[in-house]
Amino acid sequence: MPPLFCVLKAFFIGLVVSLILVKPLIWLKKQGLQDRIHKDHCEKLEKLHKNKAHIPTAGGIIFVLSVVLSILLLLPCNLWSTWFLVGATLLWGALGWRDDQIKNKRKVGHGLSAKRKFFIQNCLAIGTVLPIMIAYGESFLCMHLPFVGIVSLPHCWLGYLFSFSIAVLAIVGTSNSVNLTDGLDGLAAGSMVIACLGMLIVTFAYGAPWAFISGVLLATLAGSCLGFLYYNRSPARIFMGDTGSLFLGGMLGICAVLLRAEFMLLFMGGIFVLESLSVILQVGSCKLRKKRVFLCSPLHHHYEYKGYPEKVVVRNFWIIEFLCVAIGIFAVFWG
């Protein structure tokens, strides 16, 4: 089956699964998992988001189902890599699902503690990167840098350690960044569609050994997020929850590792990077200077505080993500 046809098929699998299954999932979630509007030390946010209370959450399970289905239908079942990806998909989905379950049981809406979640994410990332590094062999030391091209690291333990660390950081960092971005109706889902389509172009341009697998994953994620966006756009009828955001970020990071293009995430996931930087700057400034840089973080909440309508913020952030991806694509062909 031609690779391009498989990628298109993966996109439509994700799209159709989301469009068909999200609607009944909305009804099912109303029986259990619902969003909490409690925000620590953010009474204004609680008022702004009071209309979001009791909206079904954890809808991101759709993404997990879509990816597993695509992998089983489009990749050879006699290869270890197929079952490795199925396992990674289920484990990353399980992390977010467990977090949403705990949030639902607690009145204040807190899930796993930040330290425990970070520890589990690192364990999952290490368990994901190690088999990829072994499969790549010495080729794992080759990395694609924006505007530069392929760079080969020294063939020594330091080179492997650096490559391994960057890969783990890319997965964990992207997972948390998408999680931070998921704060407004349609923001994370729409941004993921743009990011995944951008990474698809990188896939065809680089042609890494695992490019076909990465293409199938990215196309499925793009289609699934697009279908989910129909129900998640303002006013949202369902939220992806941590089940969706942690999973989407983790899978986007894994795709970058498969392509040996972790640094391309700085552009392809530009809006996610900006959201994370806003939180880092805010926390750092509060601790060191006892002052805030933003009215509230992540960045999208800052503009909510300034009085911008939610739809305007989401639309503008999508535009920023599109521009970042455009720069990233230029960086690919320039290098």
Curated annotation (Swiss-Prot):
The family database entries (PROSITE patterns) matched by this protein are listed as: MRAY_1, MRAY_2
Main subcellular location of this protein, as a coarse class? membrane
**Which branch of life, at top level?**
Bacteria
Q: What class of enzyme is it?
A: transferase
Metabolic or biological pathway: Cell wall biogenesis; peptidoglycan biosynthesis
Membrane topology term reads: Multi-pass membrane protein
Q: Which UniProt keywords apply?
A: Cell cycle, Cell division, Cell inner membrane, Cell membrane, Cell shape, Cell wall biogenesis/degradation, Magnesium, Membrane, Metal-binding, Peptidoglycan synthesis, Transferase, Transmembrane, Transmembrane helix
Q: Which CDD domains match?
A: GT_MraY
Q: Which one of the record's GO molecular function terms can you name?
A: metal ion binding
Which parts pass through the membrane?
2-22, 55-75, 77-97, 118-137, 153-173, 193-213, 238-258, 263-283, 313-333
**An example of a Gene Ontology BP annotation on this entry?**
peptidoglycan biosynthetic process
- CC terms in the record's Gene Ontology section: plasma membrane
Per its record, the protein catalyses: UDP-N-acetyl-alpha-D-muramoyl-L-alanyl-gamma-D-glutamyl-meso-2,6-diaminopimeloyl-D-alanyl-D-alanine + di-trans,octa-cis-undecaprenyl phosphate = di-trans,octa-cis-undecaprenyl diphospho-N-acetyl-alpha-D-muramoyl-L-alanyl-D-glutamyl-meso-2,6-diaminopimeloyl-D-alanyl-D-alanine + UMP
Which EC numbers characterise this protein's activity in its record?
Answer: 2.7.8.13
Query: What NCBIfam families does UniProt report for this protein, alphabetically?
Result: mraY (TIGR00445)
Q: What is this protein's function per UniProt?
A: Catalyzes the initial step of the lipid cycle reactions in the biosynthesis of the cell wall peptidoglycan: transfers peptidoglycan precursor phospho-MurNAc-pentapeptide from UDP-MurNAc-pentapeptide onto the lipid carrier undecaprenyl phosphate, yielding undecaprenyl-pyrophosphoryl-MurNAc-pentapeptide, known as lipid I.
The family this protein is said to belong to: Belongs to the glycosyltransferase 4 family. MraY subfamily.
The record's annotation in HAMAP family points to:
MraY (MF_00038)
Identification of the protein by name: Phospho-N-acetylmuramoyl-pentapeptide-transferase
Which organism is the protein's source? Chlamydia muridarum (strain MoPn / Nigg)
Q: Which gene encodes it?
A: mraY
